[in-house]
From Swiss-Prot:
EC category name: ligase
Reactions catalysed: UDP-N-acetyl-alpha-D-muramate + L-alanine + ATP = UDP-N-acetyl-alpha-D-muramoyl-L-alanine + ADP + phosphate + H(+)
PANTHER family hit by this protein: UDP-N-ACETYLMURAMATE--L-ALANINE LIGASE, UDP-N-ACETYLMURAMATE--L-ALANINE LIGASE-RELATED
Protein name per UniProt: UDP-N-acetylmuramate--L-alanine ligase
NCBIfam families xrefs: murC (TIGR01082)
Keywords: ATP-binding, Cell cycle, Cell division, Cell shape, Cell wall biogenesis/degradation, Cytoplasm, Ligase, Nucleotide-binding, Peptidoglycan synthesis
UniProt-listed Gene3D superfamilies: Mur ligase, C-terminal domain (3.90.190.20), Mur-like, catalytic domain (3.40.1190.10), NAD(P)-binding Rossmann-like Domain (3.40.50.720)
Gene Ontology biological process terms from the UniProt entry: cell division; cell wall organization; peptidoglycan biosynthetic process; regulation of cell shape
Domain of life the protein comes from: Bacteria
Enzyme Commission code(s) on record: 6.3.2.8
Role this protein plays: Cell wall formation.
Length: 491
């Protein structure tokens, strides 16, 4: 970036010129790392800490950031401001040290709000679909030559990054409701994909509180802003009269302003028509499977249409859409002869979905695109509280696959809850008489326990939000083949 470009960008947030050094606690998270990446590209000195290296920290180090793989008071020395992830507790030694040194400590969303303050902000919120919809909006705006800045919670595969600094006036960002911090944002346009009971500890277990928080988020829009909302979602339909802003609805529903019609899935692609008010019907080929992704695309098209983006640019972006990391992410198709001696192949797909609605959407997309495949799922429940609160929903959804292997619950810092563990969930599913789930007590045993259930015409879904993504990549690297002790030691 040349000096003139940097000066222009730094002038966007003039008061932040006083800030030189920004330190992130929990910098390895996708949302944190994305903001750090944008700020690094704006010329700020970036440092951060996390417990282990990952692709996010490597990308930031490539940009010149200093990363500590520990949490120590001296890490915040000389920082102008400390940005914290919602996963970081208040007694973290870096946060304590920052308070003692009178260094401002702010949440991730507060920093995102500052980036958005002097740009045309587009924020994407909702229980499910935020990451993919953010990537679709970003792809359309980039295809239209608008050079947006984007900050996403997942890897935008076409760009190879979670975030990118553009020179245009638009900032497109995923808005996180998990800790209610999206209330810091003041966008010009807000998408809400759906609203379900999740992260209920933030909302004192009160769903009405969660719904009101979404309304408060939408009230951050100026009176001339716009809310784009999925009318198929019953909670959104209920809340529409309370929004108090200009709205555009989308969905399969007949009364949607942007309506999805004639949906058909062929392999990994969706084909459908979008009907828009005062516009010609748009026949879409979307390079992403599932009806849920057609809805995500409809939201992106609604925003782009309102902005006056040319239909041809929209269609090009959707047809060439490369998706996001760990969202129905195709990792390869492998011959089974070396795995278990059988002929044929197995496809391997990695997916982040960890709520029953998300898991259900992934299963439906797999069934629609590959109806003749033996559907095998390796599932890792995420958080004991979520497993407890949505126990019956998980049991119902997971019976839809042909074979289920289940890892232990990924705790994400939570203490175990009796009856909300993987063994109990397997027992409940088995009792329903449709499938006989297999508990995998040790991640190192995954390949060994997976091999016998593969038939030679399989689609393997590796599903969950914990460390299961690493397991998926490991399975791809070894091409599903169980490793001998010598091979495992060599790896």
């Amino acid at each position: 970036m040349n000096t003139q470009q940097l000066a222009k960008l730094r002038s966007i947030v003039p008061e932040m010129r006083r800030v030189r050094h920004i330190h992130f606690v929990g910098i390895g998270g996708a949302g944190m790392g994305g903001i750090a990446e944008v700020l690094a590209n704006e010329g700020y000195q970036i440092s951060g800490s996390d417990l282990a290296p990952n692709p996010v920290t490597q990308q930031l180090m490539n940009l010149g950031a200093t990363i500590y793989f520990n949490h120590r008071p001296e890490n915040v020395r000389d920082a102008s401001v400390v940005v914290v992830s919602s996963a970081i507790s208040a007694d973290n030694p870096e946060i304590v040290a920052a308070h003692e040194a009178r260094i401002p400590v702010i949440r991730r969303a507060e920093m995102l709000a500052e980036l958005m303050r002097f740009r045309h902000g587009i924020a994407i919120a909702g229980t499910h679909g935020k990451t993919t919809t953010t990537a679709m909006v970003s792809s359309i705006y980039a295809e239209a030559g608008l050079d947006p800045t984007f900050v996403n919670g997942g890897l935008v595969k076409a760009a190879g990054v979670h975030a990118r600094l553009g020179h245009g006036r638009y900032l497109i960002a995923e808005a996180d409701e998990s800790d209610a911090s999206f209330l810091h944002l003041q966008p010009m346009v807000a998408i809400v994909t759906n609203i379900e009971a999740d992260h209920m500890d933030t909302y004192q277990g009160d769903f009405e509180n969660l719904k009101q928080t979404f309304i408060n988020f939408l009230h951050n829009l100026p009176f001339y802003g716009r809310a784009v909302m999925c009318v198929d979602d019953p909670v959104i339909r209920e809340l529409l009269p309370r929004v108090g802003r200009q709205t555009t609805t989308y969905g399969f529903s007949e009364d949607a302003d942007v309506r999805v019609e004639d949906y058909q899935q062929i392999g990994p692609q969706g084909h459908f028509t979008l009907l828009r008010q005062d516009k010609e019907p748009m026949r879409v080929t979307l390079n992403a499977p599932g009806r849920h992704n057609a809805l995500n695309a409809a939201a992106a098209v609604a925003v782009a249409t309102e902005e006056g983006i040319d239909d041809e640019a929209i269609l090009r972006a959707l047809e060439s859409f490369q998706g996001t990391g760990r969202r129905f992410d195709f990792l390869g198709e492998f011959p089974l002869e070396p795995v278990n001696g059988k002929s044929g192949t197995a496809m391997l797909v990695d997916d982040y979905g960890h709520h029953p609605t998300e898991v259900d959407a992934t299963i439906k997309a797999a069934r629609a695109g590959w109806p003749d495949k033996n559907l095998v799922m390796l599932f890792q429940p995420h958080r004991f509280t979520r497993t407890r609160d949505l126990y019956d929903d998980f049991a119902n959804v997971l019976t839809q696959v042909d074979t289920l292997l289940m890892l232990e619950v990924y705790p994400a810092g939570e203490a175990p809850i009796p009856g909300a563990d993987s063994r109990s969930l397997c027992r409940t599913i088995r009792g329903r008489g449709k499938i006989d789930p297999i508990l995998v007590p040790d991640p190192a045993q995954v390949a060994e326990m997976l091999a016998p259930v593969l038939t030679g015409n399989d689609l393997i879904l590796v599903q969950g939000a914990g460390n299961i993504g690493k397991i998926a990549r490991s399975l791809a690297e070894i091409k599903l083949k169980p490793q001998t002790p010598e091979e495992a030691q060599h790896d």
